Amino acid sequence: MTPKARLLTEQRRRNVLDLVDQDGQVTVVDMVRRFSISAVTVRNDLDALASIGAVVRSHGGAVRRLEATQDYPLRTKEALHRDEKIKIGRAAAELVRPGETIILDSGTTTAEVARHLKRMRMQSLTVITNALNIAVELADIPGITLIMIGGLLRPVSCSFVGPQAEAMMNEFHADRLFLAVDGFDLENGLSTPDVLEAQLNNVMIRSAKEVNVVTDFSKLGRRSVSKIGPLDKIRRLITDNRATQEFTEALRKKGIEVIEV
């Protein structure tokens, strides 16, 4: 590449970064139109920016890099690691048996669990959730009894939290919990940006016979602000195959089953 071409490439990538910072995300289609370049060139730019940690590649584009300590809207999270979340959701749903009662925590990965359960058409299943988007997914599915946990609405996650939600959750027992987290640290356990969400998650853990954490590789080894609980309550982690061997082996040594998809 000539010095002039390199300069143009660097300037274009800086412009892409500015757009990501401004809008939260960019798409390949939009970048092709905006910069009058090929889709291949756009993908190369996004891959280069992702390789240095400046952005995170998403389906059809890239999004702003998220920090575990910050709380992001559901739509922003939905664009991240979508393929991995779909696979994780499928693997989690396949663990569920007819007649069970399960808890689905709020989150984009647990929403994928709900979508796969929807397609499975079980004859008898009870689902407890505090997430509006998950409730909408499952509300009219024959064979599914839906219990909605109410309380204080968190618009950023479309979920209910707070003392009322905790009190209601305390009234139930479940066979399995599927819990999505923002941080999964070997030393400090599970965590999330919001303290009220962390408190409700802790009640969910106590209410379930089996705790399954569903999260993609990007949350592993990270720590957020509000601690949910230690690792000793976790039966299983369902994640994608980009999780590091060091992390998964450390969990297995602690007696936690790891499913990688």
Spans of features found by a protein language model:
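Conserved phosphate- and dinucleotide-binding cores of soluble alpha/beta proteins
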Residues: 2-31, 36-39, 51, 84, ...
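HTH-adjacent hinge/linker in prokaryotic transcriptional regulators
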Residues: 2-29, 33-106, 115-122, 126, ...
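A residue-level structural signature of the nucleotidyltransferase/glycosyltransferase Rossmann-like core
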Residues: 126-127, 176
